[in-house]
Amino acid sequence: MSYASRIGLMFVFVGAGIGATAIALEAQNDAPNPYRTVPGVWAALPDGRDWGSTSLVEVSPDGETIWAVDRCGTNDCIGRVENGSGQYDDLDVVFQFNKQGRILNQFGAGMFAWPHGIDVDDDGNVWVVDARGNEELMRGHQVIKFSPDGEVLLRLGTAGVAGRTRTTLDQPNDVLVTPEGDIFVADGHPGNGNNRIVKYSSDGRY
């Protein structure tokens, strides 16, 4: 899908949440499907860990690797482990796989509340959207730019703080970086949220 098409879809999705009435549509499942599922478990996580909710995957610009974000084996990265001993801080959430599903890189432990959208720019940098927030832990309501090795290069929004200003976001859900470096963030997940598209320069200026 072209960048222009993806930007257009971001506007459509955000606009649909503004005062729209939900209309139930019956799924159309009779179209031909030329694809087949891969047998077994493709892209297994380390230590036998189960996949949690995964909202989006992204193929690198060179088509050689696949990036995916996992919500800490469940649907939330802020919660208690089964024995009540603490947070899910020790679980990475960002994974890079080769075509065969083998992990090449992983990072992001203790950095996210509810990872949602992801984009890989033309330089191979990985942009991850953290939709929900926790002000006490200073997580969420932001977009984080990583190098391919997991170094934090840029943050958009104020960690853990929801808002509708030039420096804050409220439950952003997706990000897109154009070949020219412009950054578009779809800000707003619930119907009563910000429901806006925010544009930044390549260095994060509003």
Could you tell me what each predicted segment is?
Residues 1-5:
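N-terminal secretory signal peptides that target proteins for export/translocation
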Residues 21-206:
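Eukaryotic scaffold repeat domains enriched in small/polar residues
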Residues 8-20:
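Bacterial N-terminal signal peptides
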